[in-house]
Design a protein with these regions (language model features):
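Intrinsically disordered, low-complexity regulatory segments
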Residues: 1-185, 446, 454-456, 465-468, ...
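Basic, low-complexity terminal or inter-domain segments flanking catalytic cores
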Residues: 2-5, 24-26, 127, 137, ...
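NTP-handling and nucleic-acid-processing catalytic cores
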Residues: 13-18, 195-228, 232, 390-391, ...
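Active-site phosphate-binding and catalytic loops of NTP-dependent enzymes
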Residues: 25-28, 135, 163-168, 189-192, ...
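C-terminal or mid-to-C-terminal helical accessory/interaction module adjacent to the motor/catalytic core
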Residues: 95, 103, 150-233, 270-274
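Metal- or metallocofactor-binding catalytic centers and their adjacent structured scaffolds
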Residues: 164-165, 249-279
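Structured, charged N-terminal subsegments at the starts of enzyme catalytic cores
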Residues: 276, 281, 285-293, 302
Length: 778
């Protein structure tokens, strides 16, 4: 009898697995083995992005500590990638895992299965860092944690893993993790080449989003509404007859309209056409559809996650856009109940056989769809958040549409007997099919209204304009991201395209293919979009401003976003082809066809090129946006001073301001000085006493010593306060008190009794170098 630990990704997953295993207190038995179910809370270990010097040799500390651009690019080989640090908020979780792992003969990773290998990395981290890699490590693959039969089967069929650094999925996920870490260099570049004080975060997806929106806004700004004129015909029902290559005229008066007369309409053909139901929704398109109802993307993501954890929806971060035959069969018994719940007549769901377009072998979790737990009523879902009901209804109707018949319409074509080159067509609905259930939220559909052809059509002068680019919306953005490099309207980075083609050819020769497409998964797209629309705060202070804002559903760049956009032209990090390269490299690394370290080294080339390109872009950007930069703005002035027989770098600033020359001289002489600063919270001035002293703080590397200004507390008040005893002093009263005179004040209020009294007031010494108000009576 062996003891096996099942490691889940998060508490909710552990609860579901425990329920499926019939565990009591997260302990049970199966097939004669003892089972202990434990969990992480996402990634328990991470790279310390706040101090990357922990990961490099001591002789390279200064290079990686400094934000000076001369220290770029980084060398991926300089980093000790094993130096992951535990999150500060997971000590108890790690303690529990260490206790349980020490009791076990085997550890089974049962985290989420995703196409990037993240679940594998997340599972290996605590096993490796806590020192249990020597034990038998297995992996259970499943797609739905709420499915008892499936999870038990996955556990019974678990696969023994190779050592961590030989595990193909770990290598794939670790490469992506390290690539994104090293890409922080681009953010250092944009801060330095921006206004030197604003963080402008960059990354494969972040930069692509800014680039796509910025390009569209630039197209709109450059658009010129230049009219042209031509002859068209219109029948009595408003149908327009157009000639494909009609001559265009710059002025309306130039159009020879008198040469045309009324034409007779004749039907020249009819054709019955069908459209199949739209694709199943990704999380990004679901979020964009709900944004139009006023729901923030962040709220939708959180609510969907809770719906999933309760079994009402399937795995949100899926990359799949279809379901498997087994998943299709599992849904069939639930269809009528779901339909009645969301207001769909089950009799309309007559296509209950798998569609080749929506049901395929392969994939992992299957596309987003309702879960196996069907609520008794929609109000039951409101406990999960304001968007919960709308999420479920949209998701359900989207899936139910695949069980309805095709939309069928008759396309009628007509022309004019006298001018046969002038044609028109209309679509006449015959069977609504799936359109009676669901409106495709992934496209902007045109009106379904139509009118039959009239008998005749009259000529008229048509004023036309070049089509104006549509305003960017979240739905539009997600469509562009799904297109990947095909969304690129500019010049492609040929070096990336060529390298990607080489890797794809290599994969094809060995029978592999890239499972991911577009720029990011649907869940990642929605998550990064949400990040870019809100400020990031640390200890109440904004460290990163929003880059995008949505105004009545239309996307705009903030001033920070515009700054970032104008730094991106012709860069590799802003290339829409970059993610496709990374996906190809991930797949090849997993397949053992490429070396992870060599792929990471390629980033040096991108950084070198982008640094030069952004320097050129920076000059244009600062000129366009009227940004003046002080090269010293982001540097604290320091001076090397000898203190207690040792040299120290000592800051000449405190409280956001520089010490005056006299204050600095007094501090260096060992004197205690008074310093007045403005409170960041109250905006009022305050005065403190302080001196230079050796101090210390506890950091991740242990106790760190430094010499700096020591705040000794507030300085004694030497002038009259603004008020006392409920009485607000006038300027004249304060002037008299400050020169030692006595004033008489009526209706002073006792703080102890609340009673009013009259008294003589005088400003006297308080015995501590300051002044205080002293009352006297009589």
């Amino acid at each position: 009898m062996a003891t096996i630990a099942i490691l889940n990704e998060k508490p909710s997953q552990a609860r579901n697995i425990a329920k499926n295993f019939g565990a009591s207190g997260f302990r049970t038995t199966r097939n004669g083995d003892n089972i202990i179910i434990v969990h992480a809370v996402g990634h328990l270990y991470q790279y310390d992005t706040s101090d990357i010097t922990k990961m490099v040799p001591a002789d390279k500390y200064d290079k990686y500590k400094s934000w000076d651009l001369k220290n770029l690019p980084w060398h991926a080989s300089d980093f000790d990638w094993d130096k992951l640090v535990p999150r500060s908020d997971v000590k108890d979780v790690l303690k529990n895992l260490k206790t349980v792992f020490s009791q076990c003969d085997e550890i089974c990773i049962m985290t989420d299965v995703d196409p990037t290998g993240e679940g594998q990395v997340l599972g290996w981290e605590p096993i490796d860092k806590l020192g249990f890699s020597h034990k038998k490590i297995t992996r259970a693959y499943f797609s739905d944690e709420t499915d008892k039969e499936q999870t038990l089967k996955a556990f019974d069929n678990r696969v023994k893993l190779k050592p961590m650094k030989q595990d193909p999925e770990w290598k794939m996920g670790a490469f992506r993790q390290r690539w994104d870490f090293v890409s922080m260099q681009f953010s250092r570049i944009t801060r330095n080449l921006g206004d030197k004080k604003t963080n402008l975060p960059q990354g494969r997806l972040k930069s692509a989003i800014i680039r796509i929106i910025g390009d569209r806004l630039a197209e709109i700004k450059a658009y010129k509404k230049i009219p042209s004129y031509q002859v068209k015909f219109k029948d009595s029902n408003g149908n327009i007859f157009t000639k494909g290559d009609a001559e265009q005229y710059p002025k309306a008066d130039d159009v020879p309209i008198k040469d045309f007369k009324t034409g007779n309409v004749q039907l020249v053909g009819t054709q019955t056409k069908k459209t199949t139901p739209p694709a199943l929704l990704t999380l990004s398109f679901l979020s964009s559809a709900l944004e139009s109802k006023g729901y923030k993307t962040d709220e939708v993501l959180k609510t969907y996650q809770m719906l999933y954890q309760s079994g009402f929806c399937t795995y949100p971060r899926t990359e799949d856009k279809f379901v498997t035959p087994d998943q299709f069969d599992q849904m069939l018994p639930l269809i009528d109940k779901i339909a009645n719940l969301v207001g769909v007549n089950p009799k309309e769901l007559t296509h209950r056989k798998p569609r080749k377009t929506h049901v395929k072998e392969g994939g992992v979790h299957g596309a987003n769809r309702p879960g196996k737990n069907v609520p008794n009523n929609l109000q039951e879902l409101s406990q999960f958040g304001p968007s919960a009901i709308d999420i479920y209804v949209l998701l359900a109707r989207n899936y139910l549409a695949t069980l309805a018949e095709d939309y069928e319409y008759e396309q009628q074509k007509a022309n004019l007997k006298e001018y046969p080159e002038y044609t028109s067509s209309i679509s006449v609905p015959k069977k609504l099919g799936w359109k009676s259930i669901y409106t495709d939220v992934s496209i902007d559909e045109e009106s379904e209204e139509y009118k039959s052809f009239g008998r005749t059509a009259d000529p008229y002068v048509y004023e036309g304009f070049p089509p104006k680019p549509a305003q960017p919306t979240m739905k539009w953005l997600m469509t562009q991201l799904d297109k990947g490099s095909k969304a690129n309207t500019g010049v492609k980075k040929e070096a990336i395209v060529k390298r990607t083609e080489e890797i794809l050819k290599l994969l094809n020769e060995h029978g592999h293919k890239v499972e991911t497409s577009g720029i990011g998964t649907g869940a990642t797209q929605a998550s990064i979009y949400s990040d870019l629309t809100k400020a990031k705060k640390v200890k109440g202070k904004i460290v990163t401003h929003p880059m995008i804002k949505s105004v009545k559903g239309k996307l705009q760049l903030t001033s920070q976003g515009q700054m970032s956009y104008e730094l991106l032209p012709d860069t590799y990090i802003g290339s829409l082809e970059l993610t496709e390269l990374v996906y190809a490299e991930m797949t090849a690394i997993k397949a053992g066809l490429l070396n992870m370290d060599k792929c990471l080294d390629e980033i040096e080339f991108f950084v070198k090129q982008d640094l030069q390109t952004m320097m050129i872009n920076s000059e244009k950007m600062r000129k366009n946006l009227n940004i003046e930069v002080n090269d010293l703005v982001d540097q604290k002035e320091k001076e090397v001073l000898e203190f207690e027989g040792k040299e120290w770098n000592v800051s000449r600033e405190w409280g956001g301001e520089r010490f005056t020359d006299q204050q600095w001289a007094d501090l260096k002489a060992g004197k205690t000085i008074e310093v007045t600063r403005i409170s960041a919270k109250t905006k009022n001035p305050y005065t403190v006493l302080g001196k230079l002293s050796k101090q210390s703080f506890k950091g991740d590397k242990g106790t760190v010593e430094y010499v700096g200004f020591e705040n000794l507390g507030f300085a004694p008040k030497k002038e009259c306060p603004n008020s006392w005893g409920g009485h607000v002093f006038t300027d004249d009263e304060k002037a008299k008190l400050n020169v030692g005179e006595t004033i008489y004040v009526e209706k002073l209020k006792s703080a102890k009794t609340g009673n009013f009294y009259n008294a003589n007031l005088k400003l006297e010494d308080d015995g501590n170098g300051g002044k205080k108000i002293v009352p006297s009576f009589g």
